[in-house]
Design a protein with these regions (language model features):
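A gly/proline- and charged-residue-enriched helix-loop-helix capping module
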Residues: 118-131
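N-terminal secretory/targeting leader peptides
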Residues: 2, 6-18, 25-120, 136-349
Length: 349
């Protein structure tokens, strides 16, 4: 039995909707959206639910989205992309990095010290990059949008101020490139989906995890570790990319007017809406953690950050050098990604 589900109906006040005349006999369609975080998570409450409500409102209630958090439709987080491809779910939200090496081009944003510290420039850059470079990479699904989060933070059971403090530390990483960056800094990276982090910490399988502030409360990380290390400024240590994707046959089967509604809530508009969650909720969570008596927020110095950047340079070189065998020019993609991030960061001021 499915324990919890969110059925999101039309009628959310204050949402602008395009003119859509509803015939008396108009078909109503419900799409199932599947993801891996609990319903209390910020992305569920502040992005997926409002987004689904907006779609319902603008379709005059004809297109409803039923959200299933915490893998309630079965499977494991790395299977979400294939669930959209195969029609197990109509829509999924996941990390391309959950299946290491399968989507190599989008990894360019996940390389160390490439991303901006804010989510909005990263999200806009990833979506624009998709238009030119990623359509073939995600051809098995209908991408609604792609984006990336803000600065990642190292949360651990010991104080981390210098590279030497990371030596041998077992840290959960979200993507292949984040893992390589941690290894370059001397840590012992361990890959796992974020819902597994609390149990792994409790059983001392890991000493900490790298995640953005936004996700911390949903996995009770502030209760399980006491030390939170930030990397100052931009570029930041790492980010993670995300995709909101739909089964292509399900999309193709929608009536034209409902496709129009979904398309209006896709692409850059959806990427910006998602990024706002990280940029707004991250500082709120950080402040909550700062007020906890036993928790300590640490920011490494600029000089120490420079050491980390130098140590991580081989990670970028290895990705570039391996790109030719995968059929693309890694150096060119890296230059393009950096240029797009810089453009959108400058536009925000």
């Amino acid at each position: 039995m499915i324990a919890r589900r969110s059925l999101l109906l039309a009628g959310a006040a204050g949402l602008a909707a395009p003119a859509l005349v509803r015939p008396a006999s108009a078909q109503e369609i419900t799409l199932r959206l599947h993801h891996f975080l609990p319903a209390v998570s910020a992305v569920h409450r502040h992005f997926l639910m409002p987004w689904a409500q907006k779609v319902a409102t603008e379709s005059q209630g004809r297109l409803r989205i039923q959200i299933f958090p915490s893998m309630q439709l079965g499977g494991a987080p790395p299977q979400l992309f294939d669930q959209a491809r195969d029609g197990v779910a109509d829509i999924i939200w996941t990390l391309p990095g959950n299946t290491p090496g399968r989507f190599p081009r989008i990894e360019v944003f996940e390389l160390p010290f490439v991303a901006d510290r804010r989510a909005a420039p990263n999200a806009k850059a990833v979506w624009e990059f998709y238009q030119t470079h990623l359509r073939d990479e995600f051809r098995e699904v209908h991408p609604i949008t792609v984006w990336a989060h803000d600065a990642g933070v190292i949360h651990a059971n010991k104080e981390i101020r210098r590279m030497e403090d990371l030596r041998g530390l077992k840290l959960r990483f979200p993507t292949r490139q984040a893992g390589e960056a941690l290894r370059a800094l001397g840590a012992a990276p361990i890959g796992m989906p974020v819902p597994q982090v609390p149990e792994a910490l409790s059983q001392r399988v890991i000493d900490g995890a790298v995640v953005p502030w936004e996700v911390v409360p949903s996995i009770r990380l502030q209760e399980l570790v006491r030390h939170h290390t930030e990397i100052p400024g931009s570029p930041t240590f790492y980010t993670t990319t995300f995709i909101l994707a739909m089964n292509p046959a399900r999309y193709a089967g929608l009536p034209a007017e409902l496709k129009q509604v979904l398309d209006a809530n896709s692409g850059m508009a959806a990427a910006e809406m998602a990024a706002k969650v990280w940029d707004e909720q991250g500082p709120v969570v950080r402040e909550q953690v700062a007020r906890r008596r036993d928790n300590r927020i640490i920011q490494i110095t600029e000089a120490e950050k420079e050491r980390w950047m130098i140590a991580c340079r081989p990670v970028l070189d290895a990705w570039i050098n391996g790109s030719a065998a995968r059929g693309f020019d890694g150096a060119a993609l890296l230059a393009d990604a950096r240029g797009l991030i810089a453009k959108h960061a400058a536009a925000r001021g």
